[in-house]
């Protein structure tokens, strides 16, 4: 079940250290999309908390990794999470630490710093409803050995994808899509990153509907 990803304690004590952070607090930037439109660096997770108060997260994977040192074996938790507002923004991150909560906090921080806008649309030739329930065109993303292809689907199709991809797509606000996957999709982090990279590519092309805006 998705849970709130907002770090209220950190947000309450947040003192911006970057120019973008100061612009957000001063009201000169009022949306996360504005940051991406202006190609500004996103270096503080509190910026995401501030601009997306409805941000949620879902845990994708928890594992224990071991490292052999002179002192013996050291075990640490590795947590993989996806964050999103279910309305056009999504990010994936991982964190390692001896304690689970510390690893979770690191994963959430990384996911927020890796958040990306997602262009939604109705790109299937079988559907012309015009609602942003799918993606506008076919996109591909890669991470490690994993390659993911996302294809627009008509309304009512649902998310035809594996569990990891479904969680990422839901957090992005995508309701209908077909997927093709290649490579070692059992590697949760790479699978999730490949999906996010595919969604990020929805903004690498200017669709006809955006010609007048460009």
Swiss-Prot record:
InterPro entries: Ribosomal_Su5_D2-typ_SF, Ribosomal_uS5, Ribosomal_uS5_arc, Ribosomal_uS5_C, Ribosomal_uS5_euk/arc, Ribosomal_uS5_N, Ribosomal_uS5_N_CS, Ribsml_uS5_D2-typ_fold_subgr
Domain S5 DRBM positions: 55-118
SUPFAM superfamilies: dsRNA-binding domain-like, Ribosomal protein S5 domain 2-like
Superkingdom of the organism of origin: Archaea
One Gene Ontology term, aspect cellular component: cytosolic small ribosomal subunit
Keywords: Ribonucleoprotein, Ribosomal protein, RNA-binding, rRNA-binding
GO MF term (any one): rRNA binding
GO biological process: translation
Pfam families: Ribosomal_S5, Ribosomal_S5_C
Family recorded in the similarity comment: Belongs to the universal ribosomal protein uS5 family.
Task performed by this protein: With S4 and S12 plays an important role in translational accuracy.
Subunit structure as annotated in this protein's UniProt entry: Part of the 30S ribosomal subunit. Contacts protein S4.
Alphabetical list of NCBIfam families matching this protein: PRK04044.1 (NF003125), uS5_euk_arch (TIGR01020)
Domain topic, free-text comment: The N-terminal domain interacts with the head of the 30S subunit; the C-terminal domain interacts with the body and contacts protein S4. The interaction surface between S4 and S5 is involved in control of translational fidelity.
Full protein name: Small ribosomal subunit protein uS5
Protein's organism: Staphylothermus marinus (strain ATCC 43588 / DSM 3639 / JCM 9404 / F1)
